[in-house]
């Protein structure tokens, strides 16, 4: 077993790993992680948002239907801002673990690993701050000595919010035939989140996830990742490694958009593989509605019964607690598959 002395800033991920290993819970049917080096890297579809509006919308709709993921350039988020965000992010995660976990930073939004992990296949080798947009500028949000972090996070959140809205409105227009600037309803700074992620180098990378396979329980996600790589998505029943592109943001469709679009747009399973040598950083923006917001549909007939985001979120959390796995949209089908399991 490799020795791995964790520093003062590192979360006790190795302790979690070894505890699960001692329990002998290695294999529960989830395919083991696969190093990105063993897969062909693919560049996602790239859409330049400064191009012709109709052509951009068509390209995004095709990518959302075929891939569930795409990249956008010409997004208006300055490279200098993203680089500043990365510097501040590194300073934040270099703080002592006890300060991050118990110091109340960023409204106590710190999390690490997978508290509900019942086996190694449920363990995520990562740490994060998951921050509600409204709290970023709130006077009660504690940034400690990181005086520049508040302003940088606010700028990044505002910029990513504009990108998310632009993409969401364009994708919706392709299905309903007209422009609806308020789409999706119920999404504002009190319901959307900015997540700062760090994936530490992992000595058990061969059989550990950086982030376990999942789909996103939102309308859509906008991601800025570094150049380390590790993001993989399911395409044609196999995992595909996403090739990082420094000038692009990644957009992926969430479960709520798939339901609203009557399955035209795909919420695709994705994961992050652990890296034995390098740490990885990313920033994600989640476009979410209020808990009481109906998800709705672009038109009937819809394969899904009516539900709110709150109902969906509660069901996902209940499934994870009961089974260790997210079931997601199949729970809300009007006509579930025989046996009641996922499609």
Residue ranges and their predicted role:
Residues 1-343:
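Peripheral, non-catalytic segments flanking oxidoreductase cores
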């Amino acid at each position: 077993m490799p020795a791995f002395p964790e520093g003062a800033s590192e979360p006790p991920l190795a302790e979690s790993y070894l505890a699960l290993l001692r329990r002998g819970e290695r294999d529960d049917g989830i395919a083991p992680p696969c190093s990105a080096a063993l897969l062909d890297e693919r560049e996602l579809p790239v859409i330049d948002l400064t191009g012709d509006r109709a052509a951009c919308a068509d390209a995004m709709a095709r990518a959302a239907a075929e891939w569930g993921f795409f990249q956008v350039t010409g997004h208006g988020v300055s490279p200098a801002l993203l680089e500043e965000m990365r510097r501040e992010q590194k300073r934040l995660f270099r703080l002592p673990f006890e300060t991050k976990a118990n110091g109340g930073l960023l409204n106590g939004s710190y999390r690490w690993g997978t508290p509900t992990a019942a086996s190694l296949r449920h363990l995520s080798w990562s740490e994060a701050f998951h921050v509600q947009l409204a709290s970023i500028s709130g006077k009660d949000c504690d940034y400690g000595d990181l005086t520049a972090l508040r302003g940088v996070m606010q700028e990044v959140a505002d910029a990513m919010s504009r990108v998310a809205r632009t993409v969401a409105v364009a994708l919706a227009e392709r299905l309903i035939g007209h422009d609806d600037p308020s789409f999706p309803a119920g999404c504002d700074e009190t319901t959307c989140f900015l997540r700062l992620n760090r994936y530490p180098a992992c000595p058990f990378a061969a059989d550990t996830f950086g982030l376990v396979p999942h789909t996103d329980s939102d309308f859509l996600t906008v991601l800025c990742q570094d150049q380390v790589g590790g993001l993989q998505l399911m395409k044609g029943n196999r995992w595909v490694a996403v090739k990082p592109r420094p000038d692009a943001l990644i957009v992926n469709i969430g479960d709520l958009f798939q339901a609203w679009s009557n399955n035209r747009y795909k919420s695709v399973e994705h994961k992050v593989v652990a890296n034995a040598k390098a740490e990885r950083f990313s920033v994600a923006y989640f476009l979410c509605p209020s808990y009481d917001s109906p998800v709705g549909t672009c038109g009937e007939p819809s394969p899904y019964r009516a539900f709110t985001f709150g109902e969906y979120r509660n069901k996902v959390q209940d499934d994870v607690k009961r089974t260790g796995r997210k079931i997601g949209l199949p729970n809300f089908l009007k006509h579930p598959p025989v046996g009641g399991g996922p499609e």
